[in-house]
Amino acid sequence: MSDHKEAKSFSRFGYIMVAAGAAIGLGNIWKFPYLAYGDGGGAFVLIYIVICILLGHPIVQAEQAVGRRGRASAAASYGVIHPKWRFVGVINIVCTFLIDIYYLVVSGWVLKYFVTYVVSGDFGKDKQAYFDNYISSTTQPLIYSLIIIAIIVFFLFFGITNIVEKASKVIMPMLAVLLLVCGIYALIVVPGAVDGLKYYFVPDFSKFGMQQFADACMQVCFSVGIGWGIFTTLGASMNKDANLKADAWWVDICDTFIALLAGFVIIPTVVGTGSEMSSGPSLVFVAMTQIFETLPGGRIIGIFFFASLIFAVISTFFTILEIPRMYVQEKTHTSHQVSLIITATLVYGGSVLCSLSKGILSWLKLPWPSFQGIAYYDIYDWCDCLSGYVLLPLGVLLTCFYIVKAWGFNEYEKELTNNGKHGKLSMYDKLSLAVICPVLTLIVILHVFGFI
């Protein structure tokens, strides 16, 4: 059994900061702006916010309730209420483990760029070539990823409640301030940044279709952190008197605010300088280094920007590494420290394969079946697709079925509202879990396999 049962419960502010920190990460700062730019700007932002309300919020509530009721790991918490549905939590854990693996690779890239800015700020004349050469190299990416995982293990070695809550109370406000300062500075000094701001906030539905809608649904799962087991795990440490409904809203608001801030920094800057966003990695590691080079004080801005990414990485890893760790502890009956070392070793081992798949293992391709045929991806991209476009929405879909069929609305309402102390389960809440959320997640799953 997890040591969460004996763990001191989070304070309300501490929980909100920890939960927001777990949800906020590279998905918000790296992936959200790229998708918003390519999927219609303001149109994507508007649909994203709507889906966050329709899909993100109900599932955050549900996962928190499952975790607080179970007081254990994601898998065990689902099993406490109904043993036959334990597999839902296992799917969450497998998904998070895969995300941990490739997330660690990207985190190492972030640390490399931060260190380079601090030391020299020199990325050569061809920023794309610099990036490509670095990620395809063998030794350096592995070293930087090892440094990241070592930092995370060092902090978590002393316990999630004591370390994570204190760190998140500092990291999350600091991240918001860093992004806000960078965004305001860009609007002041970048010619044409106002046009980028208009593109970002004024909807253009001419570029919006099924692909963009599926992207928005997937991004809500990835960005808010639903389907990972994040809120089930953190819910295990929530006070029994906590207002789950209100806390879920605060987590949603904090997450969306940081995502919008990231777009506020990046999109006006890129549009104003005439740069192109061709992919997620190119956005942060190529386009932004090109942009910072042209700005007064660009090296300082680069240091602060990549520092904010490191804060996001650390705050996210504090929780997403804990999710598989708790499962390992339950299965191996080892201590917190031993299970942490085992989990971190497995994650780093997987990240080595992902990193090398961009270089010396680039020849190794894994099959990806779809209605349109079979595609082949390297290990990194395969883990990304499986976790983001299949396991995340599948986890959300099964959570809906679990609440509706296994737990039942009556028992769910008792846990969610503290037996009516914090309101009641509305007809809309029931409709969300029974119809709206399942339909939205099915759209993503069917789309990724080429059916729609």
Q: PLM ranges: what are they?
A:
Residues 1-30, 59-64, 68-80, 86-87, ...:
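Membrane-interface "cap" regions at the ends of multi-pass membrane proteins
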Residues 8-19, 44-47, 84-97, 142-148, ...:
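Select transmembrane alpha-helical segments in multipass membrane proteins
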Residues 13-51, 230, 235, 245-249, ...:
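Transmembrane helix-boundary motif of multi-pass solute transporters/channels
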Residues 3-7, 34-39, 69-91, 104-163, ...:
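Inter-helical loop and helix-membrane interface segments of multi-pass membrane transporters/permeases
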Residues 88-91, 325, 332-344, 382-441:
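C-terminal membrane-solvent junction of multi-pass transporters and transport-like membrane proteins
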Residues 14-16, 22, 138-143, 254-260, ...:
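Loop-to-transmembrane helix boundary motifs in multi-pass membrane proteins
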Residues 7, 36-62, 141, 258, ...:
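Extracellular loop-to-transmembrane helix junctions
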Residues 2-9, 165, 169-314, 318, ...:
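Membrane-embedded translocation segments of transport machinery
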